[in-house]
């Protein structure tokens, strides 16, 4: 893991890729341009790892569609000439070759040669692409060799457009100054693996490397079919790695007594261990050991040892909660003692709902709340909220905004625009004197996950589980220009804007109440299981003899929930005895098959059994997840039973028959290929977005959801809020009750006035 000695091996491979400068263009075929590389000399103090000649290598193609800001293409302009991409390099790898393949189209109005595209890596100039006469207005292909000596753990490739459309008196804001970078542009990299020491002080590297932007794939190995305690230990570890993976995604393939050809986690006890550990000495305590793969020294295994299953659980909790103390090739987990009980809705990845939250707490990187440039880039703040936050009657969300900015050059010409989930919210002028740089706002919102109605509140700004608050500082910048005889020239100065870390937003005044079943809340936020971040209110129901695919489904699911909450499932309960589910006050997560006690429940709208399946369909199906049909449209119209040989999986949600405040989520599949489809859907954000309602059917064609059957409610509302909620979706009844209330109030006032009038006219009358 340490990078020592010299960069010579990587340098020889990297420099051999640098071709000579060429320019050629044909009208019919996009030209391929090879940039003349600039060769900045690396610092003599630079250290590089020793790469063995036999070290494995891998080739990576990072397209702009994957790693550039959406939509992947870039429009470089005169006033906004910079664009770029970011990528990381694992600490157990070194780059030996890198080539940037660009696809771009320059404006036909540019002056050839004077206009250029400069390519930087970590602020070191890598190459220059002059715009030639033949390229103007045409798609151009170019290759820029990247010196691998300058590739570090975290890297930025910056593209700088230098554009000119005339020799004198240019206007940088001219619409003719542009160069578009295509989303098919790509960075081609060759990585060589490094030999890594068995040292846990770097944990979780190499099993999870935060510099690696790819989804985490971490196989879990058992000696044979795991019992319940081993399933629980593996779930704790998987959910912890999921909490670290976060937005990357995660997958945990399960293997019985078989080692993969990549980094993996292995569970073993003295009595039950994989064959490759047969000669390993017995342990007398919970032990976590890092060792090399027996067939590949570049692959590492994290072995969780124990005398018995109890030791495995303790070791798993040590990984989840005590890994900061790890060092050496192995550690003994002596004890893991809980000190404070978790509270509902305290997931680290969720915005706190018990007090106002500062924007500093919401930052994910240091410079997130500031921006610079003639046109500063938008400042974005993510708000991950519990999906059951009840906002139906909310007057708005209080936000105390503190911001600083460069004074606008002209008065009443610049403004701050605030948007929520791509919907415009409010605008404020940027004063040149900065007399007002603090705002007390109330963000008007509409509940997005409760009932989807849009006739209750105006404006209809939807607030869901995942939200994006955006601040756009828009400056009216004076630009040089004029004519050749009367030219106005000056150097435009970039603007700087900052949202203060002490700005706050307050979600502490709201109840928790949601209409269920709602598979969208499960797919986006792991709800209802994520209500307790440690899954202490969750009971997972597994088959008595789980297959590798069924175990993978369990680990992928708890890993995904860990990624959404940011906390491991240290208190998850797992059972394979359906008789226990009736006695447990918990939400049920069912893997593989619905227990016999529940199969005849009328609340179930779909069942998958081997090659046969049946489903209930509603009277009328809505096309969009955000539209909540009324009770008549949701009613089951028909039940169809089908026998087929093709694979299918499903996610089904319904109310628990044992507790009306608890829910059941069942993950079902009919075959090994069905489980593969199910796991792909759980790990694919696009397919998860297609899940809503009470039933999600997963086939080779994709995910199709239904909203069918009765709705039930989870959470608590005061009686007056309950009354309003019941009437909010029945405007006629609300109008009738309002009219009756007015008549009753008028009659009471009339009677009071009559009594007062009699007393005034006849004081002796009682």
Swiss-Prot record:
InterPro entries: Cell_synth_B, Cell_synthase_bac. Residues 751-766 are cytoplasmic. This is Cyclic di-GMP-binding protein. Pfam families: BcsB. It is found in: Cell inner membrane. Binds the cellulose synthase activator, bis-(3'-5') cyclic diguanylic acid (c-di-GMP). Keywords: c-di-GMP, Cell inner membrane, Cell membrane, Cellulose biosynthesis, Membrane, Signal, Transmembrane, Transmembrane helix.
């Amino acid at each position: 893991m340490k990078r020592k000695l010299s960069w010579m091996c990587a340098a020889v491979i990297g420099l051999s890729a640098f071709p000579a400068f060429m320019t050629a263009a044909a009208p019919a075929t996009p030209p391929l341009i090879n940039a003349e590389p600039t060769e900045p000399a690396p610092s003599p103090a630079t250290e590089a790892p020793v790469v063995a000649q036999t070290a494995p290598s891998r080739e990576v193609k990072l397209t702009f569609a994957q790693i550039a800001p959406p939509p992947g293409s870039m429009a470089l302009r005169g006033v906004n000439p910079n664009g770029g991409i970011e990528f990381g390099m694992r600490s157990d790898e070194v780059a030996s070759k890198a080539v940037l393949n660009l696809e771009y189209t320059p404006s036909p109005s540019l002056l050839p040669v004077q206009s250029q595209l400069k390519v930087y890596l970590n602020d070191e100039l890598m190459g220059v692409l002059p715009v030639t006469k033949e390229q103007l207005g045409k798609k151009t292909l170019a290759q820029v060799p990247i010196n691998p000596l300058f590739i570090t753990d975290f890297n930025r490739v910056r593209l700088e457009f230098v554009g000119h459309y005339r020799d004198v008196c240019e206007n940088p804001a001219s619409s003719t100054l542009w160069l578009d970078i295509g989303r098919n542009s790509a960075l081609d990299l060759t990585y060589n693996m490094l030999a890594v020491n068995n040292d846990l002080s770097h944990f979780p590297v190499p099993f999870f490397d935060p510099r690696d932007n790819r989804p985490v794939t971490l196989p879990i190995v058992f000696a044979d079919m795991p019992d319940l305690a081993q399933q629980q230990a593996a779930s704790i570890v998987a959910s912890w790695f999921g909490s670290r993976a976060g937005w990357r995604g995660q997958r945990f393939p399960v293997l019985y007594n078989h080692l993969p050809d990549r980094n993996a986690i292995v569970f073993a006890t003295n009595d039950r261990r994989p064959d490759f550990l047969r000669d390993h000495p017995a342990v007398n305590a919970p032990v976590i050991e890092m060792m090399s793969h027996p067939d590949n020294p570049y692959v590492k295994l994290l072995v969780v040892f124990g005398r018995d299953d109890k030791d495995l659980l303790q070791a798993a909790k040590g990984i989840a909660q005590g890994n900061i103390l790890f060092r050496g090739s192995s550690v003994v987990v002596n004890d893991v003692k809980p000190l404070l009980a978790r509270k509902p809705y305290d997931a680290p990845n969720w915005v706190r709902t018990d007090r106002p939250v500062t924007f500093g707490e919401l930052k994910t990187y240091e410079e997130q709340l500031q921006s610079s440039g003639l046109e500063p880039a938008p400042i974005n703040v993510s708000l991950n909220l519990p999906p059951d936050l009840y906002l139906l009657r909310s007057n708005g969300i209080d936000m105390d905004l503190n911001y600083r900015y460069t004074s606008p050059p002209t008065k009443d010409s610049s403004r701050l625009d605030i948007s929520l989930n791509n919907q415009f919210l409010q605008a404020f002028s940027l004063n040149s004197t900065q007399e007002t740089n603090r705002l007390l706002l109330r963000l008007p919102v509409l509940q997005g996950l409760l009932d989807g109605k849009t006739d209750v509140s105006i404006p209809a700004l939807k607030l869901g589980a995942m939200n994006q608050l955006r601040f756009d500082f828009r400056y009216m910048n004076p630009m040089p220009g004029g004519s050749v005889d009367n030219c106005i020239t000056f150097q435009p100065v970039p603007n700087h804007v900052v949202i203060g870390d002490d700005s706050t937003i307050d979600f502490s005044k709201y109840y928790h109440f949601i209409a269920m079943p709602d598979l969208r809340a499960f797919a986006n936020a792991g709800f209802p299981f994520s209500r307790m971040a440690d899954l202490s209110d969750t009971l997972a129901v597994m088959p008595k003899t789980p297959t590798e695919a069924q175990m993978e489904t369990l680990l992928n699911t708890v890993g995904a929930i860990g990624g959404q909450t940011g906390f491991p499932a240290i208190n998850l309960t797992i059972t394979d005895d359906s008789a226990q589910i009736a006695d447990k006050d918990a939400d049920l997560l069912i893997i593989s098959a619905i227990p016999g006690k529940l199969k005849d429940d009328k609340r179930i709208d779909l069942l998958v059994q081997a090659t046969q399946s049946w489903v209930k369909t509603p009277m009328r199906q809505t096309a969009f997840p955000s539209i909540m049909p009324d009770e008549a449209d949701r009613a089951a119209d028909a039940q169809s039973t089908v026998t087929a040989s093709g694979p299918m999986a499903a996610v089904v949600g319904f109310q628990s028959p044992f507790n009306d405040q608890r829910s059941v989520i069942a993950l079902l599949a009919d075959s090994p290929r069905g489980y593969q489809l199910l796991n792909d859907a759980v790990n694919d954000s696009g397919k998860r977005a297609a899940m809503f309602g009470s039933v999600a059917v997963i086939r080779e064609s994709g995910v199709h959801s239904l909203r069918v059957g009765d709705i039930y409610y989870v959470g608590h509302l005061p009686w007056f809020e309950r009354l309003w909620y019941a009437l909010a979706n029945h405007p006629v009844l609300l109008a009738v009750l309002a009219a009756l209330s007015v008549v009753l109030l008028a009659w009471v006032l009339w009677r009071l006035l009559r009594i007062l009038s009699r007393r005034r006219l006849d004081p002796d009358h009682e």
